[in-house]
Curated annotation (Swiss-Prot):
Binding site for ATP: 15-22
Protein name: Cytosolic Fe-S cluster assembly factor CFD1
Region Disordered: start-end pairs: 80-110
Binding partners and assembly: Heterotetramer of 2 NBP35 and 2 CFD1 chains.
Gene responsible for this protein: CFD1
Cellular compartment(s): Cytoplasm
Source taxon at top rank: Eukaryota
Protein's UniProt keywords contain tRNA-binding: no
Keywords, in A-Z order: 4Fe-4S, ATP-binding, Cytoplasm, Iron, Iron-sulfur, Metal-binding, Nucleotide-binding
MF GO annotations: 4 iron, 4 sulfur cluster binding; ATP binding; ATP-dependent FeS chaperone activity; metal ion binding
Lineage of the species this protein comes from: Eukaryota, Fungi, Dikarya, Ascomycota, Pezizomycotina
Function, as annotated: Component of the cytosolic iron-sulfur (Fe/S) protein assembly (CIA) machinery. Required for maturation of extramitochondrial Fe-S proteins. The NBP35-CFD1 heterotetramer forms a Fe-S scaffold complex, mediating the de novo assembly of an Fe-S cluster and its transfer to target apoproteins.
Pfam families: ParA
Species for this entry: Coccidioides immitis (strain RS)
Residues the entry annotates as binding [4Fe-4S] cluster: 241, 244
Principal subcellular localisation of the protein: cytoplasm
Amino acid sequence: MPLDGVKNIVLVLSGKGGVGKSSVTLQLALTFCLQGRSVGILDVDLTGPSIPRLVGLEDAKITQAPGGWLPVTVHPFHTPSSDGLNGSQRANKPDDSNESSSSTVETAPQSTNFCGSLRCMSLGFLLRDRGDAVIWRGPKKTAMIRQFLTDVLWGETDYLLIDTPPGTSDEHIALAEQLLTIQQTYSLRSSRATAPKLAGAVLVTTPQAISTSDVRKEINFCVKTRIPVLGVIENMSGYTCPCCGEVSNVFSRGGGQIMAQETGVRFLGAVPIDVGFGEMVEGWKKDSTGQDQGNKATKKGQDARLDSYDDLLVERYKKCWSFSVFEEFAKKLIGLIEGSDQQ
């Protein structure tokens, strides 16, 4: 069945392009992983897929399995070597079941000593050349969305984040219709398999009025398609000088929070521009074996495997100052989706 093993689906939407929606998707995915959840990213921005570049796997190719496509692995389930756990502790893999809690957002599930796996699927992996333009009409886009949602073998996945194109286009309509069809298909099955939960949408905006006005249209889209709005993230909310620490409001200030208050949706928080994150995704790339091209380690066996974890994108991301901001977003969202938020 489509999406067997996927527990929760979260859409990431934006009204305008260039607001950092794909980078927000990736950072949410990485912080979900660091909360011990297994995560998948489905990139349905068909004409401008960004996820392969952001994860440093532009040259990766999709593997065809008997039951469908296998998504590209960004990193496996692992325990970072810096955690200092011994072999027996590593062997005791925790249960990934989403336990509900009676705590509020402020006491949402804490970080674990384990990092969940991250896999991704994008049209960018299927193009013959990464510079090829995708010039498709609506029916072909709809067919591709349907295939992404029915033919990808995600396996056990706690969260599937769907990175969408800006606005409300053919991709969004096809996505909403296909997810509804999948829900109906599961309801007709006599087996014990449960349908993936469409947890809701995270909306991304920048502070300017021209961006927040288009996000209002996204909220209206969610209302009409009955997709819950989990919250709004204001991205690029100022620039922090690396020398003096002064914050300059390059793109106005507070527009996302004001819009959230006026529309009655949750404001998750604001994220200033993180130069370190940009340098990380621009200057880091894996080779065809999945290893960091800059990693010259020659160790073999278990030690080499553990050392390689420190070179993973998720481990490098923890050094970016925006990690702490997105960690709070992840805890809030996990609390909302898994039932630990009583608000």
